[in-house]
Amino acid sequence: MNLYPWLQHSYKQIIYPHYINKGHHSIILESHKNIGITCLAKHISLWLLCQKKNKSIYHCKTCHSCQLMNSKNHPDWHYFGSNTCLSKNSSKTIGVNEVRNFTNTIFNSAQQGQNKIVYIPNIKKLTEFAINSLLKIIEEPPQNTYFLLINYLPHKIITTLRSRCIIHNLYGPTKENRIEWLKEQNINTNQKIHMSMLYSNEISFISKCKHSLFFLYQERLNFFETLLTSFQEKNFLKMLNVLNNKKCLDQIFIWICGIILDSIKWKHDINTIIINTDQTKIIQILASNFSILSLDNSYKSWIYCYNNIKNIPGINIELLFVKQLLYWEEILNIFN
């Protein structure tokens, strides 16, 4: 997979110190999800393991090491958790025993005679004891061993780990990046509705492109039509069916929070930066009928609802949505 253009600058910033032999052995990549951070981690790994890396800041693609990486069989690239049946999407934590098990492996010499990489795709899965055990290794690492860790915001890294690593904060693509990349993928960006979808949240850009744009287009239209009807009939519970759509749950929160933010912009007469340009009717209803305070509290309540869904295992999502819709109606009535 090619490196995404909006991550090229970050890639060069990370690789160049290593190219001149002044790089740090422990790197943390920190960002929100779905901007291509795992792709960046792979390209960093490819270069660190490349047998011809002294010739360029990019891996050569042809040496034996590069071929092993592309076939996912490199013996010196250690995916943290692969030996414990943990996948990247697993909800299980990684404990101190797993750290001790892989420690024995990395203290051996590199099988390809180059570097070794320990790749941890999500710091959040490490228990406190696992982190403490990992810290001991990072403080005195084996020769030619690099640690590449990913931290997804808003999760906060403990101070002791932060102080022992170089942290690179990564950001999503700009509008220009997105349009250019979509053109390269032969995706039509002329339709205003698609542009609204793509601009609504930069951190989920790649995630949206992985889905069918047509599917999201239909779901988004259905969502806003139901939202408009709910306001017109003054019955928020009508939204329950569209909210309870697990196929695009994250997008639903993006849409509803986005429309609330647009209505706040409208009240402040800054209409030029509105995202949902095709939904001005709903924006005007919110802006003309509700106060800034009620809209602000509405936005916060939906963020709180989203965090509960993401962070409370086994929560009854439908019941939570019923509670949230009734609470939202109460907010709009009380603070208006």
From Swiss-Prot:
Under the heading InterPro entries, the entry gives: DNA_pol3_clamp-load_cplx_C, DNA_pol_III_delta_C, DNA_Rep/Repair_Clamp_Loader, P-loop_NTPase
Q: Which catalysed reactions does the entry list for this protein?
A: DNA(n) + a 2'-deoxyribonucleoside 5'-triphosphate = DNA(n+1) + diphosphate
Q: What molecular function terms (GO) are annotated for this protein?
A: DNA binding; DNA-directed DNA polymerase activity
General function of this protein: DNA polymerase III is a complex, multichain enzyme responsible for most of the replicative synthesis in bacteria. This DNA polymerase also exhibits 3' to 5' exonuclease activity.
The question of whether Cell cycle is a record keyword is answered with no
Q: Which organism is it from?
A: Buchnera aphidicola subsp. Baizongia pistaciae (strain Bp)
GO BP terms, alphabetized = DNA-templated DNA replication
EC assignment: the record states 2.7.7.7
Report which gene this protein is encoded by: holB
Q: Which domain of life is it from?
A: Bacteria
Q: What is this protein called?
A: DNA polymerase III subunit delta'
Q: Give the UniProt keywords, A-Z.
A: DNA replication, DNA-directed DNA polymerase, Nucleotidyltransferase, Transferase
